[in-house]
Amino acid sequence: MLMVVAMTDITQFQNTNKGEHDFCSGLYLVPTPIGNLRDITLRALDVLKACDVVVCEDTRVTGKLLKAYNITDKKKIVYNDHAQEKDKNRILTYLNEGKIIALVSDAGTPLISDPGYKLVVEVIKQGIYLTALPGANAILPALQLSGLPSDQFTFGGFLPSKDKALRDSVESLKNRSETFVFYDSPRRVAKSCAVITEILEGRSIKIIREISKLYEEMIEYDPAIDMSSLKGEIVVVIEGQSKNINMSLNDIEPMIINALNKGESLKDLSNMIADKTGLKKKDIYNHAITLKD
């Protein structure tokens, strides 16, 4: 459990409500199912039953979930991409009054490509109790189903919808060896994959859709496949660059310069780039010295 109030006795947050499960006042980040209603944890249900207020993106969507588990007496507040400062302040007022607040998204884990982070930042600043419950998300199941390396991966949110932004985003992956996970929409995924194939020639691309639902499917992308009929939630998983690809020191100069600009030491950046590219640490180190000078 993430405790963000350093060196503070948790009892100061205790809510006076008593029941089968006692929870202290504060903000609880509660994951919700991404497709199958049964993919909710017992602890998440405990929090939803015990909380005073449920903060959600859409009261209709959250209302259906609560009703499915016979939780019908909860006050619901909308907090989404269109939320204003007054909406955030209203929630903070409840928290400072000692209320138990559950923050949920329409589907999956709150704050993952989802509104809510501004509220969390303020909660941390004010020293209000905060905890995040583990639970459903689309990222890890997609990575598991892809069959691509999962020891190192990067989640990049939604792939850009505009052409230049998409190309720039994909170009930035060229010299990186970890697996990449992105969200995309059914109407854009064919174009996105075509651009990825053009720029990252030879990389494996997996499309995973409808995770945990009846028509869950993993597709190995091929330009010949007709994807016009794809529906549902889409996750795109992209293979990283093979470390066996021959790269020159000139190829990694942007990586070195970027690391130097971030203030990384020559030793650290040499280790990091060697791990990603397979080049010798000593060669990278010496080349970085020349660039630094």
Report residues per predicted region.
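Conserved helicase motor
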Residues: 79-85, 159-160
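Alpha-helix capping/helix-boundary segments
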Residues: 60-62, 108, 138, 188
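Glycine-rich, flexible N-terminal cofactor/catalytic loop recognition
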Residues: 6-80
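Glycine/small-residue-rich loop that forms an oxyanion/phosphate-binding "nest" at active or ligand-binding sites
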Residues: 88-137, 141
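Short active-site oxyanion
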Residues: 48-54, 127-131, 179-180
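Class I SAM-dependent methyltransferase SAM-binding "motif I" and its flanking Rossmann-like core
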Residues: 118-176
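General beta-strand structural signal in soluble alpha/beta enzymes
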Residues: 56, 132-135, 182, 207
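A contiguous loop/helix-start segment that scaffolds small-molecule binding in enzyme catalytic cores
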Residues: 12-13, 24, 100, 179, ...
